[in-house]
Amino acid sequence: MAMNYNAKDEVDGGPPCAPGGTAKTRRPDNTAFKQQRLPAWQPILTAGTVLPIFFIIGLIFIPIGIGIFVTSNNIREIEIDYTGTEPSSPCNKCLSPDVTPCFCTINFTLEKSFEGNVFMYYGLSNFYQNHRRYVKSRDDSQLNGDSSALLNPSKECEPYRRNEDKPIAPCGAIANSMFNDTLELFLIGNDSYPIPIALKKKGIAWWTDKNVKFRNPPGGDNLEERFKGTTKPVNWLKPVYMLDSDPDNNGFINEDFIVWMRTAALPTFRKLYRLIERKSDLHPTLPAGRYSLNVTYNYPVHYFDGRKRMILSTISWMGGKNPFLGIAYIAVGSISFLLGVVLLVINHKYRNSSNTADITI
């Protein structure tokens, strides 16, 4: 059956409008934006515009990469592994749970002097601080000194929320697993008498963490009284108000604790432990020679096949030792420059060729 079709009766597939009514339409407004008539600029890619970009990138990135790589190589750094899994290691005896506390000493030699300020780190391997449940296992309100959160921690801290019917301060898995080895450094002089190296334990945390994110509960001068009604984390040897004798570095504002609470993104990481400040421009901070590292071994890592190490490092304008960044700049610059040369040869070949059919745009 045939039927008459009248375009006036239909607008964009819609039903016919009622007599005297307004036709409904889905047509976009007649504006430059909705009709895609905005002014635009589309560059024409030619050899004269593209090739200089490749060469400029190469000429910029390669020198920068060389400078970063050389700067990184000039940074002094030494790592001392003291896990103790090897039978010959002085710390092997500390793997036994029966030896508590355990002390071990590792001797090492600095072949070259360390100039300027020296940073001492502790490093852990195969420790996944980036696990989702681990990262969430904390109460930031409690760490910020909130009195109600102190006695009623967040449920995110489970199963380290309460112990012995008391709230844990600080609660959570991050605080419960805090690194608690003690590291001491000694210079062995010519008379073989060890000279202790001064290690500064303040100034290792970020300013915002120390002064904004972490605060002790309000109250009087007695910090123990402020934490009354709470208990220490399960794995801690002492409560949080006994972390340091310095009142400006005790409790939640203890800088070792603050550094640990900033979780790492990768399973192998290092965290700042101490600062060794330069005292004289005439003498190196750590002269070349023999040293000993005295360890109070408290933190077990062999249960999860982890490793522990102590790192001494200087820094430069670009931070710590990082050869990868310089290599990456050199690689990108070299690839860009090489592509520029290849495209230049191709352009020269086809530009002088009479057979323009070989050129595809």
Swiss-Prot record:
Q: Primary place of residence?
A: membrane
Which positions does the record annotate as the modified residue N-acetylalanine?
A2
Q: Which cysteines are joined by disulfide bonds?
A: C91-C104, C94-C102, C157-C171
Q: Does the keyword Disulfide bond apply?
A: yes
Q: Where in the cell is it found?
A: Membrane; Cell membrane; Golgi apparatus; Cytoplasmic vesicle, Secretory vesicle membrane
Q: How is it modified after translation?
A: N-glycosylated. Contains high mannose-type oligosaccharides.
Q: What sections of the sequence does the record tag as coiled-coil?
A: none
Subunit structure of this chain's protein: Component of various P4-ATPase flippase complexes which consists of a catalytic alpha subunit and an accessory beta subunit. Interacts with ATP8A1 to form a flippase complex; this complex forms an intermediate phosphoenzyme. The ATP8A2:TMEM30A flippase complex has been purified, and ATP8B1:TMEM30A and ATP8B2:TMEM30A flippase complexes have been shown to form intermediate phosphoenzymes in vitro. Interacts with alpha subunits ATP8A1, ATP8B1, ATP8B2, ATP8B4, ATP10A, ATP10B, ATP10D, ATP11A, ATP11B and ATP11C.
Q: Where is this region: Disordered?
A: 1-29
Protein family according to the UniProt entry: Belongs to the CDC50/LEM3 family.
Q: Which UniProt keywords apply?
A: Acetylation, Cell membrane, Cytoplasmic vesicle, Disulfide bond, Glycoprotein, Golgi apparatus, Lipid transport, Membrane, Transmembrane, Transmembrane helix, Transport
- Gene Ontology terms for molecular function: aminophospholipid flippase activity; structural molecule activity
A biological process from GO:
aminophospholipid transport
Q: What is the protein named?
A: Cell cycle control protein 50A
Q: What is known of its domains?
A: The N-terminal domain seems to play a role in the reaction cycle of the catalytic subunit such as ATP8A2.
Purpose: Accessory component of a P4-ATPase flippase complex which catalyzes the hydrolysis of ATP coupled to the transport of aminophospholipids from the outer to the inner leaflet of various membranes and ensures the maintenance of asymmetric distribution of phospholipids. Phospholipid translocation also seems to be implicated in vesicle formation and in uptake of lipid signaling molecules. The beta subunit may assist in binding of the phospholipid substrate. Required for the proper folding, assembly and ER to Golgi exit of the ATP8A2:TMEM30A flippase complex.
